Amino acid sequence: MTSENPLDPNNAYAAADDAPLSEGDPTGAPADSGSDTLTAIQAARVAVKTLLDGGVRYVVVSPGSRSAPMAYALAEADAAGRVELLVRIDERSAGFTALGLALSTGAPVAVLTTSGTAVGNLLPAVMEANHAAVPLVVLSADRPDELRGTGANQTTDQLDLFGEHVRFAVDVPAGTNPQRAVETALSAATGVFEDTPPGPVQLNLAFRDPLVPPPADHLPEATGRRTWQIGRGPEPLTLAPAPATLAERRTVVLAGHDAGPVAEAFARAHGLPLLAEPSSNSRFGPNAVGPYRLLLEHFGPDSAQPIERVVLFGRPTLSRPVSALLARADVPSALYQPLPVAWYEPGRRTELPLDNLSDLADFSGRGSSGWLDAWLLAGAAAQHALDQALSEEPAATGPTVGALVWKHARGQLMLGSSNGIRDVDLAGQPAPEPHATIFANRGLAGIDGTISTATGIAWGGRQETTLLLGDVTFLHDAGGLLLGFAENDPLLRIVVLNDAGGAIFNLLEHGAVQESGTYGNAVERLFGTPHKVDISSLAAAYGVEHCAVSTTAELAKALAAPSSGRSIIEVRTDRAGLRKLHGRIKAAVGEAARSVLAG
């Protein structure tokens, strides 16, 4: 094979994006060279070109020797402007970064690792991608067949590593043409293959020495920097008003994770209250109710206006009152499901699955007289009572932080699992229009990889991005702050609610156990996981701007300040009184709701 200039017009990566493989073959091999004669570099170039032809525009790379052929081929494509590479030394962080890129772009994103434990570090991101239906393409480099099972260094069975968490996995033997395998993998990742939801796939690419390319004429460094903008949320939809022939019913619209603007449009068109989780991307508009989870009991079976039916969009994951409502045998519920989803198995849920809005409208009906007004009046009273209760707190609390971050978010907002997203769900007042695109890892709702996911979201969306998370979640992925000098800084503001431990357990049954005294110390140690980490020093070590605040006014000022790169706002709070605070909020909201509904 003769060496080729990656910027030569005949090179595949410099060709048009839609150029077929036969035009400007990137391998440099003769057309009749056969399927088992490719060098490692030739096979890697075929794989990369096929990925790009299939719509991959971002690849996250972790360094390694066995994966070097793919790294070199990707560097050539990067220099030609056909793909953007992002380098992360920690494979777990790389996996979640790729996940975030795929979330923000909606397109398949690849992550490249060398062999051995490097591949295993991708498992958490692959599991999340599976349950969240995210098109994540794992490119795992491997030893050739003759080295497997011999005790060769960094060699194990990689193909079965992810099990049922991948839509498709294939072993590509060394020296063979990977084009068909890559095409099939991309079809599976994007949901085209066998009519399944999108999700992760694995291409296990074996390479034989030599792993480096022949001398190239010239490989310039990529030029230009990304441009960033302050965006807004998804555009609202408009549906035709419900016809008068529809039956009147006391139906509520529940919008769970990833429901989308269609949930808001449906509620508005049919005169129904909208109970929307933050990551539904439908928590806006005139029908949205703020602290809805505290109001459900006031529309229960013994109330004057009990809920008769439920229409569900997306996946509900945040609150027990919602789960209890969906579990009620006396309240029929329907799930809008126009496409296959990854978060449940058919037949395992009680909701009636409907794939079109017309049938959904027949099920839901239109709001009964006074039904929507009752919810909106109760919601306004509840929001006022909640805001009043929070204003009486001398220092910032989780709900006040959630409300402020929600109010100030522009462009993209990611909410960490645990208390962060629940604080917003409780206290975040619905806006008239969508003001940001909301992301959250709700596939398996783990706290791992949150900073890395947000970094990928910021890179992919090319917008100002805010991340709200707790200190334990922050520390779990502190390595996600590490960026090399050659990587562009994303425009990412990280708000850390630091209460020196895991506050969510204070609000669960464990909080009551701790208050009882017998297991108090054990609960604090095992669930509270107290720490004394100096986040300012940690930020300095990674070269990230940091400021600390403790009051609502200080936080509002910090959120309003312009940002030019990555920054951390540390909100120092105390979780000791959190359980009692939530008790006061519930009591205040309950009193306000009862007063309004009593008329």
UniProtKB/Swiss-Prot annotation:
Superkingdom of the source species: Bacteria
Cofactor(s) required, per the database record: Mg(2+); Mn(2+); thiamine diphosphate
Disulfide bonds: none
Record's keyword terms, sorted: Magnesium, Manganese, Menaquinone biosynthesis, Metal-binding, Thiamine pyrophosphate, Transferase
Database matches in InterPro entries: MenaQ_synth_MenD (IPR004433), THDP-binding (IPR029061), Thiamin_PyroP_enz_TPP-bd_dom (IPR012001), TPP_enzyme_TPP-bd (IPR011766)
Catalysed reaction equations from the record: isochorismate + 2-oxoglutarate + H(+) = 5-enolpyruvoyl-6-hydroxy-2-succinyl-cyclohex-3-ene-1-carboxylate + CO2
Protein name: 2-succinyl-5-enolpyruvyl-6-hydroxy-3-cyclohexene-1-carboxylate synthase
Record organism: Arthrobacter sp. (strain FB24)
